């Protein structure tokens, strides 16, 4: 194949020299017509001909260079593998090969040092933004934000006769911040102290007790009580009892979920080390220091390690830019709600609930839903996590991969949020495979999907004050089906288009259904609601009063 391309390339390059007599005749005719002078018209035509030939040769040249580059990289990997087998120093290729072999091994519960490997690397968007063509897309979003601001100011000036610079929606959404702050401090201090104290007490007493199983089960029970009873219940009770607004609730609930996952990772990664030390009858107990655990609680990862790759310095200018972009995205979402969402759902209440209204609502919600998808990704997975990584000199910045190039949903789930995916993969999927054996791979995958769907729906139900399992149905049923149907074997560009189209439609459905239900509960309140009223959709039966 490469030989044919080389021959075709040589043929095209030598095409002009195949018939020198014919070329000479043409030149003589041209010279005769112009009386020995080359006219400007002929010069322009010749330049166009050369440009066309260059464009025709361009893809062939790139293919040939790509083939040579692939051969070079393949030879480099083979040489590196042969050096590793000869006993040379450990290289990146040997590490990857070892990871591959470990993944195929029978014992799927790898010890911490053979789990996720952290290396110093930049976030993908930081690298892409160095390319002018990609950075232009970033500039386009900034330009769109400016237009949203101007549109809001102009409309308010026309309607009110003055410039209205009020942010009532933001003030309402982030209300009762003092309650949020003391709740967060209570969660943080309990997560810092209780899991560490329980683990340290268990680790020092495990090798001394005469009943290690009972000793371990008792400490595991107390840890479970903390995870579910204290950290799992108290924050939920606070947001409901104090009737916090939606954004404030999201802060508390997402931090609650994050700390539960962090505490689980800390215990899960360190328990095997203590068991191995007791098995080898080591005199030292491998208990991490408080500083190591404290660093992990703030580090932008859910996988515990005693140490991580660190950058040499902190770029405070970079940190400031990331936080400014987070606030910019926050105002971006505000203007999307003001200009695209609020008018849409205010008009919906003028018609009774029907299939026609629902379909129109879904398709009108696609644009704001997609914009919020991009903004959520950029604000949290890129800006927020990179800001904390820079302040902590955390070296591994791979919080996401190129999910926008996904041609399958399985690849999208792996690359959209690498931070959460790593936790689900190592502590849910691999542990389930270790516990139930490799034969139940599909059941383990189903369990991971169910866990993720339940946690997502729990967060939305608590934060919005009603249970409306639209996300659960989309994620658990359609997402699970697409994971098997549109799998990794699909590589053609058409499948990337299908993934994008389904993502657009799905976010339109989510925004439409949840917003309709929110407005219905605002305009059709119940005097004495029962538990069933919190789980029964009110948008289906609400009769708006004008």
UniProtKB/Swiss-Prot annotation:
It comes from the Eukaryota. It is an enzyme of class 2 (transferase). Residues 1-37 are annotated as: Disordered. The keyword Signal does not apply. Its EC number is 2.3.1.26. It is found in: Endoplasmic reticulum membrane. Catalyzes the formation of fatty acid-cholesterol esters, which are less soluble in membranes than cholesterol. Plays a role in lipoprotein assembly and dietary cholesterol absorption. Preferentially utilizes oleoyl-CoA ((9Z)-octadecenoyl-CoA) as a substrate: shows a higher activity towards an acyl-CoA substrate with a double bond at the delta-9 position (9Z) than towards saturated acyl-CoA or an unsaturated acyl-CoA with a double bond at the delta-7 (7Z) or delta-11 (11Z) positions. This is Sterol O-acyltransferase 1.
